[in-house]
Structures are given as structure tokens and as C-alpha cells.
Amino acid sequence: ASYRRQRQMCIRDSHRGLHYLSNLATDNYENVRSIVQKFLRAEHEEEIVFTSGTTEGINLAAYAWAMEHLKNDDEIILSIMEHHANIVPWHFLRERFGVKIKWVDCDASGNLDPQAIIDQFSDKTKLVAITHMSNVLGTVVDVKTICHEARKRGIVSLVDGSQAAVHMSVNVKDIGCDFYAITGHKLCGPSGSGAIYIKQEIQKTMRPFIGGGDMIKDVFTDKVIYNDPPMKFEAGTPGIVQTIGFGVALEYMMSIGMDNIEMYESELTLYARQKLEGLNWLNIQGKPSKKGAIFAFTLEGSAHAHDISTILDKQGIAVRAGQHCAGPLMHHMGINASCRASFAFYNTKQEVDKLLSGLELARDLLS
């Protein structure tokens, strides 16, 4: 209803006019900040910065923090499981400043040992950027252990929570990270919405990311006085409608209860895992000990993932096919492309069974 009302009122700018509609837009928009704070269990509302999604959030961290603090031969630690959004921005620093990227592999089952990450820490390590849950393997990473050890050593930590925040309860204070990025479209919200948690003490060391209206207090011919966070990192007319819709979606998920969602999905994942692993002609990528509701797979033989996906689509089953924006992981596993089925709290065991029937049809048609 909030989303529809905002659309109907011509989407007036927030933080601009003094008239009723503008003030209403501002109130509705800013209310979402407290919703995200509650969802992530951040200590301060001001630690929530709105973005267009996880990609912008991580780039904000790269441009506004990392490019101000990292120099030649400084190190960034990444896992091989990272999404391109948590890889490419760090390559920018490698290309422009000579920063070194150190990679940590997962094991054959898709597990990522936090100690393997910690063992790569050195006096030159300035940042560890790690996924909370692999968007390909479903591996749930012990980011708390990694982030707490990083803090002891003065290393900044960034967590890509795009996948994990959908499936489990997140507490950024408990994790101990400095950045935690999420995206709205995976959380039942509109595309083009998202947020990044930035710890207050880190915000104080950051320069603005994008220049324009709202991120300033005043502008002169010879200087600019920047606004305080979080406005300092939110320039121009924001995605007002998208952000309000994002807030509505988060309230909906919290009304169900993230612990309830995690419990339901754990049972569904176990059911799907038993069924899929029972197909000896189906190759499942990664079988980590702690896994979210994500399964990447190929068929035995030469069947291409795109063909499998097309056949499943004809049966009313939507899967993704390709490299899933995780090229380094796919190269590491020696796979050109795979299909990925992702389950959520609105899926059922009957739909898992339908996937199995679709896979059997694909096998018959492509063998």
C-alpha cells in the first residue's frame, strides 16, 4: 500500500521541497532506514546507506573507503567463491594502485575453512571481502570468525550478504563486520533497491562516493562542506519508490520471522538434497556441510546448461543457466556452465518433486 500510494502521488522528491507531498516522501523514505537497521540489527540507524543493490554497495566501499586507504602492495583477501560484484571493484584497485589480491580456494565439497582465510592475513592485508553465502554452491561461510579475527589485526572486513540475507537471520553487530551489503530484489523487494551497512567508525574515514545534491551542507566557489553520514554517501534524487517498496518487503519478511524462514528452508533444503543426490546421472556442484537452499548442477554427458534450462522452462520451472556471475569459481571447478535452482520460503516439497520430474525429462530428451 505504501508503495502504491507513493506511485500515485507523482513520486515527489524526498529531502527537497517543504510542501506536504515532499515531506511525506521524505518521511516514508527515511522510515525504511530504521527498518533496514532492525533487519540487520545494526547499532545505529545512520550506519545504513541506501544503494541500488549489492553491486553499488560494494563499489561504494571500494571507491569511498578502499581507494582512500589502500596503496601499492597492500593486500585484499578474497575467496574463490565470490560473485563478480565482489571481485571486479577490487581489480580496479589492482589495476590503478598496484594492490594485490590473494585468493583462498574452497575444498572439493565447496566448504570454505575460515582458518584458510585467516592464514592469508599478513602485515600488508588491509581488507578481507567475503561472501556470507555462495550464490552458486549455497555454502554458508563462517564470516563471524573471519571478521572478528580481522578486527583484532586492524583489517577491515566486508561481507557480501546478497544471498545470505534472504535465507537467514543476520546480526551485523554479532558478525563484527565493517561493511555488509544487501539487495532488495532478492528480498521480495523491487529491483534497483538495496543498502549497505557501514560501521560508524569506518564512515568517519570515508570520502563521498558520488557528488551532487543532498550529500552536501553547502557549496562555495572554492570549497564544499559535505553532509554527515549517511547522507554524505547518497547524492541526487534517490530511488524513492524502490526504497519504500524495499522497506515494505523487509517488514513482510520480518513478520514471518527470519528464524522461521531459516528453519523452513533448512527442512526444504534437506529434502531437495536427498532427492537430487539420489540421481546418479546428476552432477551437483559442491556438497558443503552447511548449505543454503541453492543447488547448481549439470547432467552427465554433453548436455548444455542452456538446453537443460530451456526444457525445464517449458515445464514451468525457472532455473538460471550459465556461470552465475562467478567466473573464478566455475574455472576452479572446471565447469563452463551449470544450471542453478534456488529455493525460498515460498517454495514447497511438491515443487522440488516437479524439478526432479523436469530433470528426468531433460535427461531423456538430451541423452
Could you say what each language-model-derived stretch is?
Residues 5-8, 12-367:
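Pyridoxal 5′-phosphate
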